[in-house]
Amino acid sequence: MPGTLYVVSAPSGAGKTSLVNALVRQDEAVSLSVSHTTRPPRPGEEDGVNYHFVDRDRFQALVAQGDFLEHAEVFGNHYGTSRSAVQALLDQGQDVILEIDWQGARQVRERMPGCLSVFILPPSREELRRRLTQRGQDEPEVIDRRMAEAVSEMSHYAEYDYLLVNDDFDRTLADLQAIFTANRHRLERQEPLLAETLRDLLG
């Protein structure tokens, strides 16, 4: 049976990437889609692992070819998700996570209506600013811009199926895992897998 496509969104600093990476490590049935981006790699990031890093000309060529399930501009950089790569994983029975913003999520819902979506919130504005500052990667004016972008991103929370608040990492990870586990036990997914057992029980 094909896997389920999940969209996970959050403002920068909410802990989305750490949560998603932890889920992928602990659940073999979950894969993370590797997006294309025009932004430069951050320290420790690897091409093909964290992102496919491409220049703007290559990115626009992929857009023109219709290769992206979704694409968006965030903080002046472009991000996109390969349609064929996602479909290949789903066909293998893997649940696939797209770690994208609300703009990309809206595009994916239109093109793949069966996807499920999760929005992750920080516990407070103060905590979000602390996390962004703690990274040590950005100047104060950049932090201010990211905070403004975060408020804009969070205003779209109601477009999602599930809402989590990342105030305790382990608890939030368990809640995220519970969403995936519960979906796998929906009737329409379990009935084909349990066909023989059901025949035996009801025969």
UniProtKB/Swiss-Prot annotation:
UniProt keyword ATP-binding present: yes
SUPFAM superfamilies xrefs: P-loop containing nucleoside triphosphate hydrolases
The protein's Enzyme Commission number: 2.7.4.8
A molecular function (GO) term: guanylate kinase activity
Record domain Guanylate kinase-like: where: 3-181
Superkingdom, natural source: Bacteria
Keyword entries, A-Z: ATP-binding, Cytoplasm, Kinase, Nucleotide-binding, Transferase
Residues at which ATP binds: A10, P11, S12, G13, A14, G15, K16, T17
Keyword Flavoprotein on entry: no
GO cellular component terms listed in the entry, alphabetical order: cytosol
Reactions this protein catalyses: GMP + ATP = GDP + ADP
InterPro entries assigned: GK/Ca_channel_bsu, Guanylate_kin-like_dom, Guanylate_kinase, Guanylate_kinase_CS, P-loop_NTPase
Location within or outside the cell: Cytoplasm
First-tier enzyme category under EC: transferase
UniProt-listed PANTHER family: GUANYLATE KINASE, GUANYLATE KINASE-RELATED
Family statement: Belongs to the guanylate kinase family.
Physiological role: Essential for recycling GMP and indirectly, cGMP.
Alphabetized NCBIfam families for the sequence: guanyl_kin
Protein name, UniProt field: Guanylate kinase
Species assigned in the record: Alkalilimnicola ehrlichii (strain ATCC BAA-1101 / DSM 17681 / MLHE-1)
